[in-house]
């Protein structure tokens, strides 16, 4: 998943309307919406924002840190200032796309961890192993990286998640569709320069 560079105004308006509707004050909250990809008589029209969840707590996982990276800010200090002083003067800085990618152990990836780190060393913000309790949903090895452009982020996902078996083409096509859901009006990314694939490991002799 990823944090988009600039929040669409309809999403911002929906979030603020939810805050007002629930009378929320001095809470670190997150709301979940989805955008309709086609017309549904019982739900709404294509492109419309529909509410899914209202959560009176911070978003889970690494998301608060990713918001910090994506907005060059500190949501923890903003929250503390809000509780202590009723507001904050902490500015929001430059905006980025912030991407989370998780790899599962046992898969044969086209590019090694070392190659990914070499190519994206200037983009990386967090790199770590994921605890076993969370790995079922998030993978075993995680990467969080910032990008100024959508194209750069899409190439990052393509590189990190590329596998050597015959499922790769289908997986890459599905990845492109999923990424497009975040910004439906964004044009498809142009292909970027590729890494040199890692040499396959030799099989151990029995």
What are these regions (language model features)?
Residues 12-31, 55-106:
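Active-site "cap" helix and flanking loop/linker of ATP-utilizing ligase/carboxylase catalytic domains
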Residues 40-42, 61-63, 110, 152-154:
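Intrinsically disordered, low-complexity acidic/polar segments
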Residues 80-206:
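Peripheral (often C-terminal) accessory segments that flank ATP-dependent C-N-forming ligase machineries
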């Amino acid at each position: 998943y990823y944090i988009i560079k600039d929040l669409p105004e309809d999403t911002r308006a929906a979030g603020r309307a939810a805050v007002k509707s629930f009378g929320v004050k001095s809470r670190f909250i997150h709301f979940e919406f989805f955008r309709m990809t086609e017309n549904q008589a019982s739900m709404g029209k294509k492109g419309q924002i529909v509410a899914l969840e209202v959560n009176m707590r911070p978003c889970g996982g690494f998301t608060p840190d990713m918001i910090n990276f994506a907005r060059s800010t500190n949501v923890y200090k903003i929250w503390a200032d809000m509780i202590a002083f009723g507001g904050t003067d902490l500015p929001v800085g430059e905006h980025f796309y912030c991407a989370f990618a998780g790899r599962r152990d046992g898969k044969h990836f086209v590019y090694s961890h070392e190659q990914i780190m070499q190519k994206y060393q200037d983009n990386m913000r967090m790199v770590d192993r994921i605890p076993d309790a969370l790995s079922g949903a998030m993978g075993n090895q995680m990467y969080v990286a910032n990008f100024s452009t959508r194209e750069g982020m899409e190439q990052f996902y393509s590189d990190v998640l590329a596998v050597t078996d015959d499922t790769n083409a289908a997986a890459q096509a599905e990845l492109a569709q999923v990424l497009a859901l975040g910004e439906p009006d964004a044009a498809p990314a142009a292909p970027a320069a590729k890494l040199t694939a890692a040499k396959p490991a030799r099989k151990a002799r029995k």
